[in-house]
Amino acid sequence: MPNYYLADDTKYTRPSTSAMSNLTELCGLKGLADSMARFDPVTGEKNKLRKSYKNQLLDLTGKFDIPSQPSLVRIIRDPVLAETGGKSLSVFDRDLLSRGLDFDATPSTGIPGFNPAMLGMPGPGKPGIGPQVGGNRLLSVRRSYNTESARESSNNEETPMARRKRKGDDDTDGERRRKRK
C-alpha cells in the first residue's frame, strides 16, 4: 500500500466573490471608476477622457494609450526575420518585370503559344467542356464532340446490350443468372 503524506493542515474556504459580485467595489476602485465614467450619474452628461485622466491611469497595469497609426517596427524587429536578414531578398531585373507585367489587351489571334484545348476550354469556333445544368442535379461537366470523326467513332461502337441482341442472346432480365442458382 502506498504511503500518503499530508503536507499542510491549513483548511481553505471558498472565496465569497462570484461573477455576480461588484468587483469594482471589492477591489476599491469605485472612486476611480466614478471619476472616469463616460456618463455623469447625476446629470447624465458625457464626460470626455481628457489628457489629465491619463495621470490617474499610470498606476494601473496594461496599456491605456492606443497608438494613432499601426507600426511596422514590431514586425521589422522580429527575431525570426533578423536571422534571415536580407538574404532571401534579391533585386529583380526591370526589363524582366516590364515583360512579365504587361497589361496590354490580348490580340485578336489569341495568346501566342497558348493551347486552350490543354485546359479543356473551347477554342475559336469549337465547343469544349461546358456546364450542364438540369433540374435539381448539381452542375456537371460534359464533353461535346464537334468533329465528324468523333461522331462516326461513337456511332460505330457497339454497346454490350446491342451485341447480345444481335447474337440472339436476349437475356436482359437476368434469366441465365437465375438458372445457375
From Swiss-Prot:
Compartment(s) of residence: Nucleus
MF annotations from Gene Ontology: transcription coregulator activity
Keyword terms, alphabetized: Activator, Nucleus, Transcription, Transcription regulation
Transcription regulation listed as a keyword: yes
Cellular component terms (Gene Ontology): core mediator complex; mediator complex
A Pfam family it matches: Rox3
Listed transmembrane segments: none
Coiled coil: none
GO biological process, one term: regulation of transcription by RNA polymerase II
Main location: nucleus
InterPro entries: Mediator_Med19_fun
Residue ranges, compositional bias (Gly residues): 122-133
Residue segments, region Disordered: 120-181
Polar residues bias (residue ranges): 143-158
Protein's job: Component of the Mediator complex, a coactivator involved in the regulated transcription of nearly all RNA polymerase II-dependent genes. Mediator functions as a bridge to convey information from gene-specific regulatory proteins to the basal RNA polymerase II transcription machinery. Mediator is recruited to promoters by direct interactions with regulatory proteins and serves as a scaffold for the assembly of a functional preinitiation complex with RNA polymerase II and the general transcription factors.
Protein family membership: Belongs to the Mediator complex subunit 19 family.
Assembly information from the UniProt record: Component of the Mediator complex.
Annotated protein name in UniProt: Mediator of RNA polymerase II transcription subunit 19
Organism: Yarrowia lipolytica (strain CLIB 122 / E 150) (Yeast)
Gene from which the chain derives: ROX3
